[in-house]
């Protein structure tokens, strides 16, 4: 059986699971106990908990988050101030229990305006009954500046990568916590005039409806199909890949279909869109690139490493598929699996994956027969994550074309990955997902990388271009790419 190695990005903070409890039963002491358990799990089980911050700094950050929770022991505050915030690991996730979260949603009034962030500015991203123009800039909510609100939003990213691809409207709702169902905003109109407005909160069903009718993102079809392509103009083909979590044979058949079409129609340009691609199977990365490589053979280089190969924290460890707690045999089998596939390095305290780890790994990867040799533009954003960041990193290393959009959410040279462990906290029933290894891209395997950047785009969208596209209800990055290709033809 072919073994698949998956690199998943768990970007959603609030992913429902199943249980039978209500929020009113969770006491302050229960929140604090679960916080302490979660912190212990992370510090003992994460493959490199002090990658970005010293032990002293991590301890101080945890103390600060715990004090914030102690001051306001509420359901949503438990997640906003979760211990996972201190590590700088976008793969580590805290997920809610379905019934608890449903109770919370039913008791919460949501911000009624859809928003979108570009270059640190928050813009109105949909029609509304208050006649606030699409493209108006949001300045304050309930006397709190947008800058302060953005700082409070937990970022799903590696290291200190600046993330602005977040659902600001949702977090305004979570952070507001007022009981009178109102939001007082200050905003700037398109002609520069500052105004105030009083808004009525809406229930979750209404919020969900509004979010589905926002202007951006435009490409809703690809979000449904995962892989989707079509002609932009007689010279240019658009290929959107929203996930790499496909069986390799299925993925190849889809790519073969589109690249055969590209060859038959003799397109000169290709726009590849991996915005909002949260990752998947790392073996699919060179597969996609093989259809556009300029070289007959290109280097596909990645390596797994971890400082923790054993299960050090076994309490509350569960099988996420069955919700069953791990037995001693489960733990023993898991430890044996890792010990057989990771060898201690001669220097440092890392264990690196050996040849037994990945029998699908091909370092010198051949170009596909249907390869495209024209010009390529790659679209990325902060939600280009995990394995998708490896694709962007490979694309940039090979100098295959221009990258348009925003910095990726994972580091360009490494991230965490693979063989996730899942824990269920005893009181809040929160599940924690922790990766067991790191993965290093393109021959980067430095033990001590205190800072990282994502893959940096060659072209970012300035506010004027963004606003014009938003008002016209056009995809800003895609429109910029088409114009870029036309200018350089």
Predicted regions and their residues:
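Conserved acidic, small-residue-rich alpha-beta core segments centered on
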Residues: 282-470, 484
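Flexible, low-complexity junctional segments that flank or bridge functional domains
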Residues: 21-305, 315-318, 375, 412-425, ...
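Sec-dependent N-terminal signal peptides
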Residues: 2-17
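Generic N-terminal leader/processing signal
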Residues: 1-2, 135
């Amino acid at each position: 059986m072919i073994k698949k190695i998956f690199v998943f990005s768990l970007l959603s903070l609030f992913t429902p699971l199943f249980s039978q409890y209500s929020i009113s039963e969770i006491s302050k002491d229960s929140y604090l106990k679960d916080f302490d358990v979660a912190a212990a799990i992370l510090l003992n089980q994460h493959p490199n908990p002090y990658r970005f911050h010293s032990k002293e700094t991590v301890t101080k950050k945890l103390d600060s988050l715990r004090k914030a929770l102690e001051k306001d022991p509420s359901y949503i505050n438990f997640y906003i101030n979760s211990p996972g915030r201190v590590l700088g690991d976008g793969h580590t996730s805290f997920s809610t229990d379905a019934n608890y979260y449903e109770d919370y949603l039913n008791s919460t009034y949501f911000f009624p305006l859809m928003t979108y962030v570009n270059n640190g500015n928050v813009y109105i991203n949909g029609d509304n009954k208050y006649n606030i123009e699409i493209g108006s800039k949001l300045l304050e909510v309930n006397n709190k500046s947008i800058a302060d609100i953005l700082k409070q939003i937990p970022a799903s990213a590696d290291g200190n990568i600046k993330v602005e691809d977040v659902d600001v409207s949702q977090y305004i709702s979570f952070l507001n916590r007022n009981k009178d169902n109102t939001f007082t905003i200050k905003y700037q109109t398109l002609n520069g005039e500052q105004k105030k407005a009083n808004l009525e909160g809406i229930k979750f069903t209404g919020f969900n409806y509004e979010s589905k009718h926002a202007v951006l993102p435009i490409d809703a079809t690809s979000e449904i199909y995962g892989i989707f392509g079509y002609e932009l103009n007689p010279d240019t083909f658009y290929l959107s890949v929203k996930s790499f979590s496909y069986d390799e044979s299925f993925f190849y058949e889809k790519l073969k279909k589109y690249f055969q079409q590209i060859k038959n129609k003799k397109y000169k340009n290709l726009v590849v869109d991996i915005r909002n691609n949260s990752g998947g199977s790392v073996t699919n990365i060179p597969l996609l690139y093989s259809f556009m490589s300029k070289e007959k053979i290109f280097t596909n280089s990645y390596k797994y490493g971890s400082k923790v190969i054993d299960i050090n924290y076994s309490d509350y460890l569960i099988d996420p598929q069955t919700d069953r707690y791990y037995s001693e045999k489960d733990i023993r089998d898991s430890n044996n699996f890792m010990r057989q596939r990771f060898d201690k390095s001669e220097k440092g305290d890392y264990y690196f994956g050996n040849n037994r780890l990945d029998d699908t790994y091909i370092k010198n990867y051949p170009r596909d027969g249907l390869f495209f040799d024209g010009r390529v533009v790659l679209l990325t954003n902060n939600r280009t994550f995990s394995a998708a960041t490896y694709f962007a990193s490979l694309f940039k290393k090979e100098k295959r074309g221009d990258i348009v959009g925003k910095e990726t959410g994972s580091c360009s040279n490494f991230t965490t990955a693979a063989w996730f462990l899942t824990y269920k906290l005893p009181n809040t029933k929160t599940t924690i997902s922790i990766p067991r290894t790191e993965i290093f891209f393109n021959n980067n395997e430095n033990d001590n990388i205190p800072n990282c950047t994502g893959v940096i785009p060659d072209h970012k969208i300035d506010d004027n271009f963004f606003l014009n596209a938003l008002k016209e209800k056009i995809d800003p990055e895609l429109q910029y790419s088409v114009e870029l290709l036309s200018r350089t033809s």
